[in-house]
Amino acid sequence: MFNGIIYQQGTVSKFLKLNAGTKIFIKSKLKLDKKDIGSSIACDGVCLTLVSKRKNLLEFYLSKESINKSKFKYLKIGQKINLELP
């Protein structure tokens, strides 16, 4: 359960469009390990599953439905995004 406390802001660094959705890459200094892959992180209020983490780069997958129903369709490279842990 998310508690509404924003732990940090990340920066949108890359989008990778796929047939069924989009991968989004966010630069962040959140202290996460490989064991956290599969965990949920709220990104600007949208609960996303962490797909991969490399150094300070977090990777998430967004389905087309998630993009269309959220503000993620308006995100731009370099934009700040709030990150919240459960």
PLM segments and residue spans:
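Conserved loop->alpha-helix
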Residues: 1-86
